[in-house]
C-alpha cells in the first residue's frame, strides 16, 4: 500500500509515479516501494543500521516516499548491492514514459568539512563515474567499499548516467552521508515535472 502523503503545497503531485519491486534470490529477499512525488517519508529495515540511516536520508532530502525491507541472511554485501538493484528498478518503473521530466539534475552538497558533487542524466544509458575515498574500511557494520557498488547498481538498473565526486573531505561518515544526500537532491531535480517540456526531453524521440 502507498504511504499516505501529507499535504505539500510546494510540490506538484503526479498521479501514479510510484512502483513496488521485489527481488528474491537464494542470497537476498528485497522489497522496495518508491514514490517520486512524496514528502520524504521512509520506512526502512535492511538489518544494517548505518545503511538504513543513509536510505532514510535519501528519502528525506529527495522528498521521496520509500519503503525498504531486506535481510542479511547471507551477508551485508549482497543486501546492499541488491537493494541498489531493486531501488534502481523502482525508480525506473515509477518514472514510466519520462514525459515532461527535467531529465538532468545536480547538487553540490556540504557537510561539515566535506563537499560532494552529484550530477544525473536520466538518459536511459547507464554509466557511473565515482570518485571518492574513505579512511576507514567500515562505518558501523557498513563496508565503505559498498558505497560505489550501491550506486553502480542503481545507475545500471535505473538506466541513469550518474556522477558522484568527493570534492574534499576527511570523515568517512560525512562523506558517505553527503553522497546519499547529494544523490537525493539531484534525483529530485531530474525527476520533477516541467510543464514547459512537451513529450520527452530529448531530440531523439526516446529515452
Which residues make up each language-model segment?
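Intrinsic-disorder-associated, low-complexity terminal segments enriched in Asp/Asn/His/Tyr and depleted
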Residues: 8-10
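N-terminal intrinsically disordered, cationic/polar leader segments
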Residues: 14-207
Amino acid at each position: 500500500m502507498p504511504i499516505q502523503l501529507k499535504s505539500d503545497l510546494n510540490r506538484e503531485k503526479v498521479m501514479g509515479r510510484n512502483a513496488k519491486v521485489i527481488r528474491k534470490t537464494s542470497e537476498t529477499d528485497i522489497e522496495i516501494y518508491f514514490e517520486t512525488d512524496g514528502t520524504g517519508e521512509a520506512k526502512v529495515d535492511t538489518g544494517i543500521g548505518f545503511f538504513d540511516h543513509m536510505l532514510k536520508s535519501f528519502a528525506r532530502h529527495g522528498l521521496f516516499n520509500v519503503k525498504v525491507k531486506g535481510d542479511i541472511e547471507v551477508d551485508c554485501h549482497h543486501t546492499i548491492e541488491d537493494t541498489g538493484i531493486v531501488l534502481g528498478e523502482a525508480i525506473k518503473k515509477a518514472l514510466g514514459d519520462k514525459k515532461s521530466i527535467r531529465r538532468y539534475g545536480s547538487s553540490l552538497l556540504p557537510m561539515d568539512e566535506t563537499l560532494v558533487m552529484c550530477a544525473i542524466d536520466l538518459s536511459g544509458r547507464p554509466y557511473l563515474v565515482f570518485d571518492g575515498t574513505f579512511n576507514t574500511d567500515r562505518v558501523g557494520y557498513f563496508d565503505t567499499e559498498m558505497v560505489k557498488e550501491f550506486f553502480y547498481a542503481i545507475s545500471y538498473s535505473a538506466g541513469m548516467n550518474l556522477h558522484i565526486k568527493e570534492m574534499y573531505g576527511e570523515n568517512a561518515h560525512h562523506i558517505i552521508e553527503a553522497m546519499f544526500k547529494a544523490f537525493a537532491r539531484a534525483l529530485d531535480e531530474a525527476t520533477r515535472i516541467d510543464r514547459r517540456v512537451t513529450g520527452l526531453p530529448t531530440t531523439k524521440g526516446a529515452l
